[in-house]
């Protein structure tokens, strides 16, 4: 009998077990497409980022000009830059939807997969933040100044830490060069974590919309889900291309078309849209250290989700109260995102404070209480 290379070759076997013969639940919906879409986003960012790095100069006097040169004189440089900038937005859209799906369907009960997954968004946020500084526009410079300054809230070592991160007494050339190095380095951290995430996922297998064991009804990943994923890739890449070609600056800040000037502060310093919910939580607490802790907690609170699962059912599909609370949380996050983009004045301050309080209360208090109530209602 001929040797099946796909199943016996040490390297091809790993690929085969992950993408071809992987036993997959037969009923997973389009919400399960976002994992593979994140993989495509990562590949797109690596390719476009590498091409941009070939033309970029990490120096305060040349960075802005090198980006302008890229868009004017490099073959399709404008397109590569637009794909990279908007690709980051699509990356965050996909990761937020992916987390939301895991939250709704109880995928967080695969604890190892979930915990590695929760480390990924902060890594991605750090990567996007240092990347945003590289074009050295006004918002790049002032965003870097404001966010790195948050580390000074750490007692005793804060100020030293900030000056060490800056490589001087303000954001300047050493900061830019190290941020370029970090942007490149964090990419590999992201890739490594992604592989660990996938390894843990394939240990347990995928969850499904019903939240019940699916061992009795599994189908091979290829051709069923490989085709389904390809449809997802096509749709997302069409959307990304449309955005990059028709409205590339829709999500950017006009302030970043002005070269960085330490002597002129922009009227509203705000990060990219995908950080606004966390930025709103940071701003809603008047104390600096408290704000920084709340900012960290806004993402790291996801580590507690498996511990707060009190329901006898895994998924929210058939639960009477939880879907309502879940969509309230989604609306709350949208309100936080909107508030983060507004100036710090009445009524936005109080709206941000209420929304921040509701965000943590919903996850830490209301979800567990509602789960216990449901168990009582359904006599479980």
From Swiss-Prot:
One of its GO terms (molecular function) is metal ion binding. It comes from Gymnorhina tibicen. Keywords: Electron transport, Heme, Iron, Membrane, Metal-binding, Mitochondrion, Mitochondrion inner membrane, Respiratory chain, Transmembrane, Transmembrane helix, Transport, Ubiquinone. Its main location: mitochondrion. It holds the Pfam family Cytochrom_B_C. The chain crosses the membrane at residues 34-54, 78-99, 114-134, 179-199, 227-247, 289-309, 321-341, 348-368. This is Cytochrome b. The gene is MT-CYB. Component of the ubiquinol-cytochrome c reductase complex (complex III or cytochrome b-c1 complex) that is part of the mitochondrial respiratory chain. The b-c1 complex mediates electron transfer from ubiquinol to cytochrome c. Contributes to the generation of a proton gradient across the mitochondrial membrane that is then used for ATP synthesis. Belongs to the cytochrome b family. The lineage of its organism: Eukaryota, Metazoa, Chordata, Craniata, Vertebrata.
């Amino acid at each position: 009998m001929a040797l099946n290379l796909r199943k016996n070759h040490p390297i091809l076997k790993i690929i085969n077990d992950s993408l071809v013969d992987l036993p997959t639940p037969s009923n997973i919906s389009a919400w399960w497409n976002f994992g593979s879409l994140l993989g495509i986003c990562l590949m797109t960012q690596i390719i476009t980022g590498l091409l941009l790095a070939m033309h970029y100069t990490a120096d305060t006097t040349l960075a802005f000009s090198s980006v302008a040169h890229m868009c004017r004189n490099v073959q399709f440089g404008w397109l590569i830059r637009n794909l990279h900038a908007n690709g980051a937005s699509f990356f965050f859209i996909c990761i937020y939807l992916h987390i939301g799906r895991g939250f709704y369907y109880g995928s967080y009960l695969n604890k190892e997969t979930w915990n590695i997954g929760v480390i990924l968004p902060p890594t991605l946020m750090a990567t996007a933040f240092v990347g945003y500084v590289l074009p050295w526009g006004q918002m790049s410079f002032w965003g870097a100044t404001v966010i790195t300054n948050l580390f000074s809230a750490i007692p005793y070592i804060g100020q030293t830490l900030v000056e060490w991160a800056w490589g001087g007494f303000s954001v300047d050339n050493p900061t830019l060069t190290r941020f370029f190095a970090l942007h490149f380095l964090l990419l590999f951290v992201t890739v490594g974590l992604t592989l660990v995430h996938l390894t843990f996922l394939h240990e347990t297998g995928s969850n499904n919309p019903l939240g019940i064991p699916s061992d009795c009804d599994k189908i091979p990943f290829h051709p069923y889900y490989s085709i389904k994923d390809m449809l997802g890739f096509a749709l997302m890449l069409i959307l990304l291309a449309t955005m990059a070609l028709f409205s590339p600056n829709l999500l950017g800040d006009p302030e970043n078309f002005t070269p960085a000037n330490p002597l002129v502060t922009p009227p509203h310093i705000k990060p990219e849209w995908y950080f606004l919910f966390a930025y709103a939580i940071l701003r809603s607490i008047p104390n600096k250290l408290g704000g920084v802790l709340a900012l960290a907690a806004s993402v790291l609170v996801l580590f507690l989700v498996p511990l707060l699962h009190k329901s006898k059912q895994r998924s929210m599909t058939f639960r009477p109260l939880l879907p309502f609370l879940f969509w309230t949380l989604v609306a709350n996050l949208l309100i936080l995102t909107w508030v983060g983009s507004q100036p710090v004045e009445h009524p936005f301050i109080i709206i941000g404070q209420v929304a921040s309080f509701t965000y943590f209360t919903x996850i830490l208090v209301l979800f567990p209480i509602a789960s216990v109530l449901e168990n009582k209602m359904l006599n479980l």
